[in-house]
Amino acid sequence: MSTAADSPLSLAHYYLPVYRPRQVVLERGQGSRVWDDQGREYLDLSSGIAVSGLGHNDPDLMAALTEQAGKLWHTSNVFFSAPPLKLAEELVTASRFAQKVFLCNSGTEANEAAIKLVRKWASSQGRPADKRVIVTFRGSFHGRTLASVTATAQPKYQEGYEPLPGGFRYVDFNDVPALESAMASGDVAAVMLEPIQGEGGVMPAAPGFLARVRALCDQHDALLVLDEIQCGMGRTGSLFAHWQEQVTPDIVTLAKALGGGFPIGAMLAGPKVAETMQFGAHGTTFGGNPLAAAVARVALRKLASPQIAENVARQSAALRAGLEALNAEFGVFAQIRGRGLMLGAVLAPAHAGQAGAILDLAAAHGLLLLQAGPDVLRFVPALNLTDAELADGLARLRLAIAAYVAQH
């Protein structure tokens, strides 16, 4: 246990100050619980921003990691190794649509690869540069690289990075007429969206919206790109969120829970685009390394299991019921939205802008949560969350909300 004098927090000034973490130094985790360097225990309903889909220190992931660590960590992509080859096959099979996979290190990299693939495909079709537009949606979040942050239709993430790359067009999420208008000029090469917007407030696509987007893409010979980096890998109750809408994409991007906490990303390419990128068209030094791929293979197998799907359904219902009960008592929420274990509690107008304050109180009561903007509490726990862990989390949340109401 560290003291204030020797706390790692004294080293925080060496960080580029692009984050605003809470003043807690987490040291270890088990399941949906973590402990800080003072020995204090927290119930984690954030799972590292939807990354630790199997909780902390999952024994099967640990076994895969340690076994592979004793064999081979890295080769680069000028040589083959078995784990990424097997992972690619398993992702193609699991996806029900893909023919090829590009493995990388993060969600941003997966989306960057998808953007490049769209442009390369449009070029291969003989389309001039001004007819390779990618439509994205306001409230989206697709990453932090220059192209992916341009795809992210939120000015707060783009400010100061101008000039941004051209060839992107923004429309309101779930607005079919606006999308029809945006595609009418015939210059759109792809539509890119999250089936559930995460950073944009846990906002699901409206029923039938994805199907309409798919139809418009077919009508205009444009690609459908689905960013499932946060909502994929079992989080909504099915391995891929778009399965519930019965649409077939051309490209899907994955990361976060795919590695169960170990960094990895993937871009899945369907038959229309699978052969577009050939030798030298794209690449990565670390992407698909044997260590990450070995862990991801086990994470994929477990996240695709019926047991996870059943648990997500049960805990989602219990979490919704618990949040509704808290709202009946305190009246702080206007709406509970989302799907599976990706839920957002939207604050009532009287409490607008107070998500951060509630999160601070939650942490003080031993509960780790996220926000999705200033008005939404975001719940993205581990998908193997137990009944007891959820009950404990809701009890701690009640104490936090009671303290918040007492202060306001």
Curated annotation (Swiss-Prot):
To which species is this protein native?
Xanthomonas campestris pv. campestris (strain ATCC 33913 / DSM 3586 / NCPPB 528 / LMG 568 / P 25)
Q: Where in the cell is it found?
A: Cytoplasm
To which protein family does this belong?
Answer: Belongs to the class-III pyridoxal-phosphate-dependent aminotransferase family. ArgD subfamily.
Per the UniProt entry, the Enzyme Commission number(s) are 2.6.1.11
Q: In which pathway does it act?
A: Amino-acid biosynthesis; L-arginine biosynthesis; N(2)-acetyl-L-ornithine from L-glutamate: step 4/4
Q: Which reaction does it catalyse?
A: N(2)-acetyl-L-ornithine + 2-oxoglutarate = N-acetyl-L-glutamate 5-semialdehyde + L-glutamate
Binding of N(2)-acetyl-L-ornithine, residues: R144, T284
Q: What is this protein called?
A: Acetylornithine aminotransferase
* NCBIfam families registered for this protein in UniProt: argD, PRK01278.1, PRK04612.1
Subunit-structure text: Homodimer.
The annotation note on the cofactor reads: Binds 1 pyridoxal phosphate per subunit.
User: Where is it found, in Gene Ontology cellular component terms?
Assistant: cytoplasm
Source superkingdom: Bacteria
Q: Which residues carry this modification: N6-(pyridoxal phosphate)lysine?
A: K256
User: Which Gene3D superfamilies does the UniProt record give?
Assistant: Aspartate Aminotransferase, domain 1, Type I PLP-dependent aspartate aminotransferase-like (Major domain)
Cofactor(s) recorded for this entry are: pyridoxal 5'-phosphate
Q: Any extra detail in the entry?
A: May also have succinyldiaminopimelate aminotransferase activity, thus carrying out the corresponding step in lysine biosynthesis.
For whether the record's keyword set contains Amino-acid biosynthesis, the answer is yes
Keywords linked to the UniProt accession: Amino-acid biosynthesis, Aminotransferase, Arginine biosynthesis, Cytoplasm, Pyridoxal phosphate, Transferase
